[in-house]
A protein has these predicted regions:
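Generic helix N-cap/helix-start motif at coil->alpha-helix transitions
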Residues: 14-22, 48-56, 89-98, 125-132, ...
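Alpha-helix boundary/N-cap detector
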Residues: 1, 18, 35, 49-52, ...
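Alpha-helical repeat scaffolds
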Residues: 2-11, 34-45, 69-81, 110-122, ...
Length: 162
């Protein structure tokens, strides 16, 4: 009961996306209160702005709440933001697409969607390392050796990253 009081106090002081998201995680994991966690994840969603935030929340929603439909909705927002050129902070657009493709494959198991996203990563790749990492993702997640080799060949044609 005292833990619940602490969480109520923490919720009253929460302001930022990570406050609400972390609190929801903790309430779900420690109090096993799915309803309260869901409420906090909904608040978190209203605070999401960039692709990475929507994608990270989708992973949590799927993992902790097992809500595939909500996760798909958030992943679609992620894709829309990336297609609009909004890459994740500190990442290139090609890497943002690759990370997103990895999530689609790992979380949803949707290989067709992941392939579509990886193609966008390849289209946006301008650096050798982007293509090398993408080749690894294509091999690991799609098990497409032929495509991975083609991406590797493309990477070899580029100069080393400066």
């Amino acid at each position: 009961e005292w833990a619940k009081k602490l969480y109520i106090k923490a919720e009253s002081k929460a302001e930022q996306i990570n406050d609400f998201s972390g609190l929801a995680d903790s309430i779900h994991d420690n109090l096993e209160d799915k309803e309260w966690a869901t409420k906090l994840y909904k608040i978190t969603e209203t605070k999401c702005e960039v692709a990475e935030e929507f994608s990270d929340l989708a992973v949590k929603i799927h993992g902790r709440l097992s809500d595939k439909e909500w996760a798909i909705k958030l992943f679609k927002i992620t894709e829309s933001k990336l297609e609009g050129g909004e890459n994740d902070p500190g990442e290139t657009l090609a890497d943002s697409f690759r990370y997103f493709g990895d999530n689609i494959s790992e979380i949803l198991g949707d290989k067709k969607w992941a392939e579509k996203v990886y193609k966008k990563s390849e289209e946006n790749a301008t650096y050798k390392n982007e293509l090398e990492y993408l080749a690894g993702s294509v091999l690991d997640h799609l098990e497409d050796e032929k495509w991975a080799n083609l991406i590797e060949q493309k990477a070899e044609e580029l100069e080393d990253d400066e």
